[in-house]
C-alpha cells in the first residue's frame, strides 16, 4: 500500500529506501496523509525534509496552489506575523473550503519573539481562520535536537508540543548506504537526460569509494555527483 502511494512522487530518490527505517517512515507518512495533524520533520541537512513536506502536502489532496513555505531563519517577528497570517488566509488561487499546508522550514531558527508570535497563531496546533474548522495544516522541519534546545531555554516547550503531532525522522545517508546505488542511478539518469547524454555506469572501484564515504551532505550531496 505505502509503496503504491509513494510511486508517483516527483523526486522518488528521497523517499525510496530498502531499509526498515525508510519503510517505517513511508508507511507512517502514508497513514497520516489525509489528516490535518501537525507534522514535524526531523533530519540532518540534505536528508530530504523539503521533499517530504511537499510529498505530505500532495498526498493530502490539497491543491498545488495551497502550499505556503515559510523560511523561518529569514524573518523577524513582524515579518513572521505577516507571512503566517497571509499563509493561513485563503488566497485567490485557493478554492473555497480548501485547507492549506503551511511549511515552517527550519522552525528551530525562530527567536523568542517569533516563537511567541507563532504560539499565538497556533492555539491548539492548527490554525482556525475565525471558525471552528481548521484552515491550515502545519508541517515543520528541523535539523536540531529539540530536547537540547528546550533544556537550554532556546525553544518553548508549549510550541514544540503544538508542532509535533507526528514526528517523521529522516535517517542520514550514512545509515542507509544500501540505498546508494539506486539513489545514484536515479540522479545520474536525471542528469544524463538533462544533458542529453547516455547514462554512465559505475566501476567497481567507484562503488567502493561511494560506500566508504560518510556523506555529511547526505542525499543532496549525492545528487550533485556527475560522472
Where in the sequence are the language-model features?
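Conserved alpha-helical scaffold flanking the Walker A/P-loop in AAA+ ATPase domains
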Residues: 30-31, 81-103
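Nucleotide-binding/hydrolysis machinery
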Residues: 1-23, 27-35, 44, 53, ...
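Conserved P-loop NTPase "ATPase switch" module shared by AAA+ and STAND
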Residues: 96-113, 118
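Conserved D-loop-proximal element of ABC-family nucleotide-binding domains
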Residues: 78, 111-113, 178
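AAA+/P-loop NTPase substrate/partner-engagement loops
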Residues: 63-86
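Short hydrophobic/aromatic beta-strand immediately N-terminal to the Walker A/P-loop
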Residues: 38-42, 103
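Conserved glycine(s) of the Walker
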Residues: 48
Amino acid at each position: 500500500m505505502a509503496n503504491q502511494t509513494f510511486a508517483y512522487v516527483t523526486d522518488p530518490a528521497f523517499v525510496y529506501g530498502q531499509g526498515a527505517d525508510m519503510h517505517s517512515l513511508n508507511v507512517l507518512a502514508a497513514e497520516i496523509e489525509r489528516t490535518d495533524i501537525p507534522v514535524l520533520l526531523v533530519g540532518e541537512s540534505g536528508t530530504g525534509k523539503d521533499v517530504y513536506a511537499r510529498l505530505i502536502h500532495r498526498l493530502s489532496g490539497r491543491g498545488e496552489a495551497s502550499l505556503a513555505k515559510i523560511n523561518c531563519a529569514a524573518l523577524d517577528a513582524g515579518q513572521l506575523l505577516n507571512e503566517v497570517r497571509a499563509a493561513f488566509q485563503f488566497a485567490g488561487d485557493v478554492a473555497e473550503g480548501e485547507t492549506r499546508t503551511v511549511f515552517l522550514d527550519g522552525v528551530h531558527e525562530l527567536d523568542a519573539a517569533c516563537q511567541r508570535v507563532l504560539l499565538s497563531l497556533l492555539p491548539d496546533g492548527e490554525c482556525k481562520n475565525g471558525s471552528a474548522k481548521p484552515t491550515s495544516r502545519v508541517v515543520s522541519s528541523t535539523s536540531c535536537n529539540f530536547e537540547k534546545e528546550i533544556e537550554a531555554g532556546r525553544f518553548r516547550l508549549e510550541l514544540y508540543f503544538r508542532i509535533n503531532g507526528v514526528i517523521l525522522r529522516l535517517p542520514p545517508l550514512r545509515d542507509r548506504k544500501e540505498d546508494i546505488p539506486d539513489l545514484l542511478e536515479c540522479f545520474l539518469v536525471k542528469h544524463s537526460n538533462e544533458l542529453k547524454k547516455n547514462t554512465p555506469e559505475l566501476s567497481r572501484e567507484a562503488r567502493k569509494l561511494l560506500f566508504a564515504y560518510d556523506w555529511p551532505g547526505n542525499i543532496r550531496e549525492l545528487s550533485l555527483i556527475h560522472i
